[in-house]
């Protein structure tokens, strides 16, 4: 699980880490990338990596979550076209997940994105008559 604080320094470190992972994926399969590789490429300390992520897979989960957030925020083209367009342009993450048998990360990210939007719409239709916690459990 990733756990990122919302301050400029943490967000800057996270961007460096994400960029490093994407760059490393261009030359190595995910299974061969180490935290030390990411640390060297990103110039952030090992402790900074672990302050924000528990594993390399968590970096990919964040990238997936960001992708689905971007897809959901888009407009114009039907959502399925936006999905294919996004992943066509961001194939490194998708390939890394599929090659390592971790498509579950992608599926979980998609489920979280869709669930949140569907839950909010349903809560709105019910006139906010249930608590946020109860609505999330439905």
How would you name each of these model-derived features?
Residues 1-6, 46, 73-92, 102:
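Primarily secretory-pathway and cell-envelope proteins
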Residues 1-28, 32, 37:
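Basic, helix-initiating cap at the start of DNA-binding domains
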Residues 20, 52, 62:
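Residues in the recognition helix of alpha-helical DNA-binding motifs
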Residues 32, 55-60:
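Short amphipathic alpha-helical segment with a characteristic S/N-K-E followed by hydrophobic residues
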Residues 33-34, 95-97, 106:
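Short, hydrophobic secondary-structure boundary micro-motifs
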Residues 34-35, 63-72:
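Short, basic, alpha-helical segments at the C-terminal edge of helix-turn-helix-like DNA-binding modules
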Residues 43-53:
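Short hydrophobic/aromatic patch on the recognition helix
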Residues 77-85, 101-137:
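Amphipathic alpha-helical packing segments from all-alpha helical-bundle domains
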């Amino acid at each position: 699980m990733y756990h990122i604080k919302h301050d400029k320094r943490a967000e800057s470190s996270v961007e460096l880490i994400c960029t490093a992972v994407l760059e490393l994926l261009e030359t190595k399969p995910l299974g061969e990338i180490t935290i030390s590789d990411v640390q060297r490429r990103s110039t952030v300390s090992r402790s900074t990596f672990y302050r924000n992520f528990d594993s390399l897979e968590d970096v990919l989960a964040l990238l997936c979550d960001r992708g689905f957030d971007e897809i959901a925020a888009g407009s114009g083209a039907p959502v399925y076209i936006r999905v294919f367009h996004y992943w066509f342009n961001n194939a490194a993450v998708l390939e890394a997940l599929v090659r390592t048998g971790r498509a579950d990360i992608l599926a979980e990210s998609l489920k979280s994105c869709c669930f949140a939007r569907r839950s909010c719409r349903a809560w709105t239709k019910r006139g906010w008559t249930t608590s946020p916690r109860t609505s999330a459990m439905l």
